[in-house]
């Protein structure tokens, strides 16, 4: 999806922490099956929430420093950031309805 920004250890601060909008970060890796199943869900959500929530993906294998800094221990993990702080965390694969509920209840 064009609505998703791929963030790295280097760009995380700029793209996520300093974002004026809430940011949903999806931590994933190539070998993670549940991450692949949920990817289309995140793409749809990123499009539907465009302008309200910024969607970002961080590959935890390529960017090992960022997830532990915010308490992510496993993948898939979704984190909603607001004003540079973690507002909410969801661990494990989620369905579209679960992700929508997660965003709406924290938004």
Curated annotation (Swiss-Prot):
Disulfide bonds join 32-35. Keywords: Disulfide bond, Electron transport, Redox-active center, Transport. CDD domains: TRX_family. GO terms for cellular component: cytosol. It comes from the Bacteria. GO terms for biological process: cell redox homeostasis. Residues 2-107 form the Thioredoxin domain. GO terms for molecular function: protein-disulfide reductase activity. SUPFAM superfamilies: Thioredoxin-like. PANTHER family: GEO12009P1. Participates in various redox reactions through the reversible oxidation of its active center dithiol to a disulfide and catalyzes dithiol-disulfide exchange reactions. Belongs to the thioredoxin family. This is Thioredoxin. It comes from Allochromatium vinosum (Chromatium vinosum). The gene is trxA.
